[in-house]
Curated annotation (Swiss-Prot):
Catalytic activity: (R)-4'-phosphopantetheine + ATP + H(+) = 3'-dephospho-CoA + diphosphate
Function: Reversibly transfers an adenylyl group from ATP to 4'-phosphopantetheine, yielding dephospho-CoA (dPCoA) and pyrophosphate.
Site for Transition state stabilizer, residues: H18
Organism of this sequence: Aliivibrio fischeri (strain ATCC 700601 / ES114) (Vibrio fischeri)
HAMAP family: PPAT_bact
UniProt-recorded Gene Ontology molecular function terms: ATP binding; pantetheine-phosphate adenylyltransferase activity
Known partners and oligomeric status: Homohexamer.
Lineage: Bacteria, Pseudomonadati, Pseudomonadota, Gammaproteobacteria, Vibrionales
The protein's name: Phosphopantetheine adenylyltransferase
Length: 162
């Protein structure tokens, strides 16, 4: 059975930690859709289209990875795509508690969707898009935390907001 795996997130912006999980997932599963969420309840720095383009740019060399934006419930997107696996990253016990609650809800809404949790590589365990955005918006360097094309996009976005 072919496994279609979703890796959902806001990716505002995509970080080296996200990319690490995508690459590791791509080596374990047949097909990965990086599902970039519209997340209207979050005030994002980048638009949905910009985030999709940034993720596409940094995953273009991964032949079994596809990138799509979506709005609405993740489980509805999973049903539409006929996904049967969901990959989520866990950095901390707080992430675990949050993800455990989400997974319980997903099971009620779509019992056939299994969740797989991956822990980050050690060098990315502290990393989050929120931290990257905050550092970038305050003029700090984030080049060690994001792919170079994302770093440039952040610089451009911050410069245009001044």
């Amino acid at each position: 059975m072919t496994k279609l795996t979703l890796y959902p997130g806001t990716f505002d912006p995509i970080t080296n930690g996200h990319l690490d999980l995508i690459k590791r997932s791509a080596s374990m599963f047949d097909h990965i859709i990086v599902a970039v969420a519209a997340s209207p309840s979050k005030k994002t720095l980048f638009t949905l289209d910009e985030r999709v383009q940034l993720v596409q740019a940094v995953t273009k060399d991964l032949p079994n990875v596809y990138v799509e934006g979506f709005s609405g419930l993740m489980v509805d997107f999973a049903k539409e795509k006929k996904a049967n696996l969901l990959v989520r990253g866990l950095r901390t016990t707080m992430d675990f508690e949050y993800e455990f609650g989400l997974t319980s809800m997903y099971r009620k809404l779509m019992p056939e969707l299994e969740s797989v949790f991956l822990t980050p590589s050690e060098e990315y365990a502290f990393l989050s898009s929120t931290i990257v955005r905050e550092v970038a918006l305050h003029g700090g360097s984030v080049e060690a935390f994001v792919p170079s094309s994302v770093n440039q996009a952040l610089k451009n976005k911050v410069a245009s907001s001044l």
